Amino acid sequence: MAVVQGKSSDVFNILQASLNYLDQGLSKQSLPYLTGEAISVADVVLSAALYPFLSDSSLALGEYKSLKAWFDHVAARHSFQSAAQKVLQGKGLQGMKSYMQRQPLPQSSVCRDSQPTNNGTPAECDEGERMVSEEEMEAAALTWCKGLNSSPLVKERQHPILPQEDKKNILVTSALPYVNNVPHLGNIIGCVLSADVFSRYGRLRGWNLLYVCGTDEYGTATENKAREEGLTPQQICDKYHAVHASIYKWFQIDFDFFGRTTTEKQTEIAQDIFWRLNKHGFLVEDTVEQLRCESCQRFLADRFVEGICPFCNYAEARGDQCDKCGRLINAVELREPQCKVCRQTPNIRSSKHLFLDLPKLETQLEQWLDKSTSTGDWTANAKQITRSWLRDGLKPRCITRDLHWGTPVPHPDFKEKVFYVWFDAPIGYLSITANYTDQWQKWWKNPHQVELYNFMAKDNVPFHSVVFPCSLLGAQDNYTLVNHLVATEYLNYEDTKFSKSRGVGVFGDMAKDTGIPSDVWRFYLLYVRPEGQDSAFSWADMALKNNSELLNNLGNFINRAGMFVTRFFEGCVPAMELLQEDKKLLAMVSWELQQYIQLMDKVRIRDGLKHILNISRHGNQYIQVNEPWKKIKGGETDRQRAGTVTGVSVNIACLLSVMLSPYMPTVSQTIRDQLNAPQSCISTMFQGTGTFVCSLSAGHRIGTVSPLFQKLEVDQIEALKKRFGGQQPEDEPPKKKMTAQNAASSPPAAVPTTAAPAAEVATANGADPEKAKLLTQAVTEQGDKVRTLKGQKAEKAVITAEVAKLLDLKKQLAVAEGKSLEPAAPQKSKKK
């Protein structure tokens, strides 16, 4: 320290250069920590190394503003201060080790170096058990013993929901689904389901939250659908609005209001915004070239033109945007355009239109974006897509179209035109709210009191982050703009895209006919939610997650906990006397709960689900090691121990019922009904950063316990996969199965230079690849279980039994892979 303060030797110069470099790097990012929104090992290690310098007030650190702000942010944490005190008291590394053990792993327990699996979910981390300090154990036990407090119950909603002075007011929207498209699984997870989970979570947190959505009903697609079905556009909208509402009801999407855009309120509000933009000089006229299909006798809407992208050469780019490179396109820029209705080549015609002057609004937009993206929770893809738009420079955007079915343009020079859907549709959020309550402006013209969350897939980002905000900024009417823009990547189906026409993939109106409960669908879609990259729905993986995570992990733990109370303690929760092992479990569960709340607050929905499953895994191991079914038959000490383990376990089950509520509402309620759980446990558990307390005290009588989940069988999954896999083209003859006989009579083929794929060889040997995939996961999980038991030094009999199960699973796997199980011929001994 003296060397630094005296500024002698080269050490100070090296340190100063390093601090400069670090400060510059921190100043270029909007994240509070080195690697993201949550504190990581990198923050801990670096802040610990720099602690002697950065905590010394005598050093002139004012020039390192970003570095100082980062260090103050880390140092403000109570656990850091505690660890620092231990360093000063001579505990050195041990103090810092204790601090590091308390912190969440980078990216919420996801291994940085692990490679993503095919469905986009993180690969499992091969990490040891998290260390728990003595202080954590005692703190968790103290909190646990306080029990349920007198916090106010989560109130039932009373409509209309309006902003309140003393509340956190959250307005949630999900992208309006287009009315005549039946949503597939990717549409559902990308918008309404993700928003539903966050909304349910927010209500449990006690936030004053309003969730609105509805069908987007104007445009050419509706006109064409009406012509196909011999109905009017309004009749088509009425018909398919009901279809959407029915699908979302089955998926348990809990809107506060589900409306539509074909309303008088839509016309009123859209035309008001239009006149305000016109008044403030943000609209310009121009003559544009459009594509007109002479065969269909109409100008073609952008989405009814398809051709080659002029930027990336993608062959199926739409007339407004390329799905591959994400660039916006004018339809006339497409190479080799085709009308999607009749497949004829359209002609170019001129027409006069109105444009939103985006370049004139660009400065206002950038100022707002800088603030919103730095203070709000925008997903990385939303930020990236928005930056790319600004980097390329904004251009005037056409807001009118030569159509009949739409919100009419009120300007006398354009009375034959309607508003373009991407100017008109986002205004649907406002009009839908206005149809919910005549006090809608308290939500939409109240930016200082309301936080707005938009949920969507990534292709909708530019219209919500650039076009719509520019419309509202230009209107200059104190509109509420998006604070948190949450965009998913794409969910594919198996190894291809969803296609209604080809019968490929599961669509919303089909899911309920599979016999699989909606909660299981919700769970799996959220488990593979495409948060950081595209993911894929897979039947085999869905069965695997249902059978391993829901049935064998979560359901197994909750059912065992409840059944022990019923069988061993006559349905009443037994008395509990906590040992150190119990306190350790309470600390681990409390940490998982805190991580869950931290992630859910940041809309990290998929990662939040992993912490629920971690808790049930801890619970299963706890039961397995303590064996209450054996101890209940022993002496007084053993019976007391069985009671404690059972009581702690059933309380963890109660906690899980609360944490599951946003994801699996029916299962959550079923668990609470089985446990006869008090309503106050919800508000208590979700207080602050998360509070795990004893909510089912000794003497509490539970209800009837029954299994929560059913196994998905291989033959059931195979039938569903075939049903939703599409059909072979009729003109394609069925492939002839090769046998030894017809192989001999076939003409000689070229000799392959590589071996046949393993899957083909396995199939030829009578293998079952799908079953093999399920069994591979089962073998992995059973192996983990055996290793855990060995590490915990469980009884030899228990380990032997689990090893036997592992060996049996390996035999089943060998059969499924088509491997021979015949024992090798014994070698003759050389001894006489």
Each PLM stretch: what is its role?
Residues 556-559, 584-587, 610-625:
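Core structural elements
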Residues 239, 243-319:
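A broadly conserved sequence feature marking short terminus-proximal activation segments
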Residues 530, 537-546, 564-608:
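Long, amphipathic alpha-helical stalk/connector segments used for oligomerization, subunit docking
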Residues 90-169, 286-296, 307-326, 337, ...:
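Basic, alpha-helical terminal appendages of large translation-related enzymes
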Residues 225-238:
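A charged helix-plus-loop insertion that forms the helical arch/lid used to bind
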Residues 110, 119-213, 265-268, 321, ...:
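Structured secondary-structure scaffolds
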Residues 1-85:
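GST-like fold's C-terminal all-alpha helical module
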Residues 301, 317, 327-330, 347-348:
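Short functional micro-motifs and their immediate structural scaffolds
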